[in-house]
A protein has these predicted regions:
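Hydrophobic beta-strand scaffold residues
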Residues: 28, 48, 116-118, 159, ...
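Active-site-proximal catalytic alpha-helix in oxidoreductases
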Residues: 131-132, 136-139, 160, 164-196, ...
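Beta-strand segments within the central parallel beta-sheet cores of soluble alpha/beta enzyme folds
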Residues: 151, 201-208, 260-264
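Interdomain hinge/lid region at the active-site interface
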Residues: 165, 213-279, 297
Length: 297
């Protein structure tokens, strides 16, 4: 009989990740509040659960992929949560992007119960999850990382143990400040080129092929030019992540002036009602600052 994995959180990222594991032959038991997400898992060969307890029961590996710190604390540490039902020796992997301190709190609680805990936030967005090419930043013990490597190899392209508990979240925070900054600069480049009457599509092709090239330019330049901001990763979630960045900077007593600017732009996006759009919608914020209505108009 194949190994059973309990997977809690089948949203934009969790759904394709759980599907990869089910198609690889794992017995995946999934739990989510959205019925359509459970149906997707069943279509991939998994099984739906009706509660956290049912998801955890019989699972030698338990995975969570949740939006933010309060969700992780409630689902994992709360009443009738994961740690009330999990057995000693179980490998617990949290793919959520949360504060390092929250991951350390989860690890402390899990260790007290004999649970092997890893924080393993990911980068790559919805497309990365669908294509199983995520970058996975891991915090925890080396032996537990090696035990989880087969899982990481099925849902991602690269994974690395970055340090002890919470280290994965620290690296994810750094990732998010780079991603947010890159989106903001690409947005400004588009606005500048269009204001100067340049063929912005040709211009971005040139940027993508030179030193300014990035994964964001590779994957997002066409949709940004089309002002297609269908969410792969929502502004609201990036706002949460920038809060993590700034909290970490205060704790480390370091100055990150550009991160403050990026956080302000993301907050402006939310104030303009763009929170449910993709983080590439920072382009709309830059256009609004310049009195434009898309494509330099």
């Amino acid at each position: 009989m194949s190994q059973q994995i309990g997977f809690i959180g089948l949203g934009i990222m969790g759904s394709p990740m759980a599907g990869h594991l089910a198609r690889a032959g794992y017995q995946v038991v999934g739990y989510d509040l959205v019925a359509a997400s459970l149906a997707k898992l069943e279509a991939a060969g998994g099984r739906r659960a009706s509660s956290i307890a049912e998801t955890v029961e019989g699972s030698s590996i338990v995975i969570t992929m949740l939006p933010a710190d309060p969700h992780v604390e409630a689902v994992v540490l709360g009443e009738d949560g994961v740690f009330e039902h999990i057995k000693p020796g179980t490998l617990f992997i949290d793919f959520s992007s949360i504060k390092p301190g929250t991951s350390q709190k989860v690890a402390k609680a899990g260790t007290a119960k004999g649970v092997r805990v890893l924080d393993a936030p990911v980068s790559g967005g919805e497309k990365g999850a669908i294509d199983a090419v995520l970058s996975i930043m891991v915090g925890g013990d080396a032996a537990d990382f090696e035990a989880a490597r087969p899982i990481f190899d099925l849902v991602g392209k690269t994974s690395a143990l970055c340090g002890g508990h919470g280290a994965g979240q620290a690296v994810k925070a750094a990732n998010q400040l780079v991603v947010g900054g890159t989106y903001a600069l690409v947005a400004e480049a588009i606005v500048l080129m269009e204001a100067l009457g340049v063929d912005a599509a040709a211009g971005l092709d040139m940027l993508a092929g030179g030193l300014a090239g990035s994964r964001i330019l590779e994957l997002k330049r066409a949709s940004m030019l089309a002002r297609d901001f269908k969410p792969g990763f929502r502004i609201d979630l990036h706002h949460k992540d920038m809060g993590t960045v700034l909290d970490a900077a205060r704790q480390a007593d370091v100055s990150l002036p550009l991160s403050l600017q990026v956080a302000a732009l993301i907050q402006a996006a939310r104030a303009q009602g763009l929170g449910n759009l993709d983080h590439s919608a920072l382009l709309a914020v830059i256009e609004n600052l310049n009195g434009l209505n898309g494509k330099g108009q």
